[in-house]
Amino acid sequence: MRIEEIAAAGSPKSKMIYHENPEMLHVNTLARHSYFIPFAKGQDPFAKREESKSLELLNGDWSFRYFDSILDLEDDFLQVESEKTIPVPSNWQLYGYDKPQYTNVAYPIVFDPPFVPDDDPVGIYSRDYSYVKDGKDRILVFEGVDSCFYLYINDAFAGYSQVSHAISEFDITGFLKEGENKITVAVLKWCDGTYLEDQDK
């Protein structure tokens, strides 16, 4: 599906429709490939990936807002700032939000695939990103998000992905402007993939 089709009239919240659609696992993600980190000529290719000039880690404290239900999310949630932060990567359950769960046999939600309950918890993560045009593409890489997420760059929808324990990559170059940019990620606790990923989590 093209991004232009998703950018039709309606609030960002009203467009959050992919997490209950088994035919829409990914939107605007790059094709799957072997994982690698580019190293410049002269760099030690066996060094830690953090030493690559082509890698910029966005780990650290992100602005964070939590909602017990997706229904509680404001229509204009992209415009609402938060004074609270949370470390990334982490589990929000370890920071006073929601509650941990271990599922071994029973589903954590009422069995009604591909639908999930209305009280689907949502976490809104946001941070600034400084960009200088240098002719290089900017590929935003998520190394695992449970259970799905919607990505926004400068309040514009940039993509969607699920499959909790897999890498999702987005070419966000075309969404960036010179200077400061805002990255926002809306993470949902449950999606249609929960019916496949529920056990031993």
Task: Name these PLM-found stretches.
Residues 40-42:
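Carboxylate-rich, polar loop motifs that coordinate divalent cations or form catalytic acidic clusters
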Residues 95-100, 104-115:
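Surface-exposed, low-complexity/disordered Ser/Thr/Gly/Pro/Asn-rich loops and linkers
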Residues 55-65:
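Mature N-terminal segment immediately following signal peptide/propeptide cleavage
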Residues 87-89, 105, 171-172:
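Helix N-cap / beta->alpha transition motif
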Residues 54-55, 77:
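Short secondary-structure boundary/capping segments within folded domains
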Residues 2-33, 44-49, 63-67, 97-99, ...:
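Accessory beta-strand-rich segments of carbohydrate-active enzymes
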Residues 63-100:
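Predominantly extracellular/luminal regions of secreted and cell-surface proteins
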